[in-house]
Amino acid sequence: MKFLMTLLSTVWIAMMGTLAAQAETDKPPVTEMILGDVNAPIEIIEYASMTCPHCANFHSDVYPQLKANYIETGKVKFVFREVYFDKYGMWASMIARCAGPDRFFGIIDQMFEKQKTWSRAGNDLAIVTELSKIGKLAGLGDDQINACLQDADNLRNLVGWYKANMEEHKISGTPS
């Protein structure tokens, strides 16, 4: 596990720099995480970081009402896009995405609910251990979680996608 933490930290630093530029040109599309009717008359795109306390507050205080009154009634198509301010938020996103679109929102709900626990767990290993617990609740195994966290191509694609979204929509903070 110590090797995994060293690898993840090294890959994170590299990806946020020069490899992100490469991802712009040769990346496969990143799956949009969508709730609600894809043909709804209104589209809301939320930009959030898994480590952002204000994003966690939005997901506990505002999002449930938005979901019940607008998303589940077919009035709104809700798109969730991650923002990567730090490696911990990136790792959380990678684990949530590893579970696929059907389980993604359940996992991020848990990640926001338990954000104070996992994001303050201490060192890298402790944080990955806490994030892995959430992934396991969604049915992911250790091998799946480790494979997702070590997938450098996916990381490169996500970083390129994130940077393109930030530039296109001029996102400077979260939640947006």
Residue ranges and their predicted role:
Residues 2-86, 159-163, 167:
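Extracytoplasmic thiol/disulfide redox context detector
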Residues 23, 175-176:
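Short, intrinsically disordered, charge-balanced linker/junction segments flanking boundaries
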Residues 47-49, 146, 176:
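Short beta-strands and strand-loop turn motifs
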Residues 84-173:
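Cysteine-centric redox/oxidoreductase cores and disulfide-bonded domains
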